[in-house]
Regions:
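Helical "lid/coupling" subdomains associated with nucleotide-phosphate turnover
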Residues: 1-155
Length: 155
């Protein structure tokens, strides 16, 4: 597990609301550093499918689809293109938590950390595009623990 979650970035680096350009640059550098550590242990180049699980990823899917309310059926299994996501993440990084909280698909507890999540997603997209020629992401309502349990159960 890499230490680069949206809460960590928001609390430690992206403290302004919205984050300053300098804070975003620092957050980008931090995420790149963490992803470099991941690359040392994970064969990124052999990745064929990127699955974004829960949290920031499901929120991005709801926003990208223009949903008026959070709809887990529309979100789970949705496929998002990196080019469209980059436009969306840039918008999320620019807006204040007050602006973001107006959107009904952004959970109230996520409005103040979603910009940090957007920085993480940008870093992941850059890495996968460059090293594995992956340009889409499939969204899952499930999280990593569901996957671990399924694997242990032999599913």
């Amino acid at each position: 597990s890499a230490q680069m979650g949206c809460v960590r970035l928001s609390e430690r680096i992206m403290r302004s609301n919205p984050a300053t350009a300098e804070e975003v640059t620092q957050a980008d550098a931090y995420v790149a550093e963490q992803l470099a550590r991941v690359r040392a242990d994970v064969p990124i180049g052999s990745t064929r499918t990127l699955v974004g699980c829960a949290g920031t990823f499901t929120t991005l899917s709801a926003l990208a689809q223009g949903l008026e309310t959070y709809d887990s059926h529309a979100i789970h299994g949705s496929v998002l293109r990196f080019d469209a996501l980059r436009v969306l993440t840039a918008q999320l990084i620019r807006e204040s938590s007050e602006q973001l909280s107006i959107n009904p698909v952004i959970h109230p507890g996520r409005a103040d950390v979603i910009a940090g999540g957007a920085v993480v997603v940008n870093g992941i997209m850059t890495l996968l595009a460059e090293e594995a020629d992956v340009h889409t992401m499939t969204i899952s309502e499930k999280d990593i623990l569901d996957g671990i349990i399924a694997e242990l159960a032999g599913e």
